[in-house]
Amino acid sequence: MSFTSFQIKEKARELGFQKIGIAKAKECPDDQNNLNNWLEEDRNGTMVWINNRKEERGNLFNYFPEAKSVISVGLNYYVGKTQEDLNADYKFSNYAWGDDYHKVLKEKLFNLLNWIKISSSEVKGIVCVDTAPVMEKVWAREAGLGWIG
């Protein structure tokens, strides 16, 4: 038994994700060229780590050769507080108000991956949340969740 994309999206919604898209894993040469040009122009500033794994970042198959599909998700991290609630001279970004989003997303994504693995012991997958050499915006765009610009 293998799950359909509809079933996977429904399960992701059950886990709390508001946005779910699935893209076929493929090479994205234009995006890889954009990354290389961006790095050559030193537009990464102090983020030198981006250059360290640019070959993996620029081509998903260099990072995860077995990839067949990429599931991209979105989760609203608004917790209902405002800057006025702080009553202070400093500000926090919305993502910093709640629990560490890396942990929250990873837990939900591992639950989704483990559920998908029920369909077949041959399913292979990895969970990436903001720290892996993956161009997440590219995959979100490819999955129909938005655009880059």
Q: What are the residue ranges of the model-derived segments?
A:
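Auxiliary alpha/beta "docking" domains used to position bulky ligands
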Residues: M1-G149
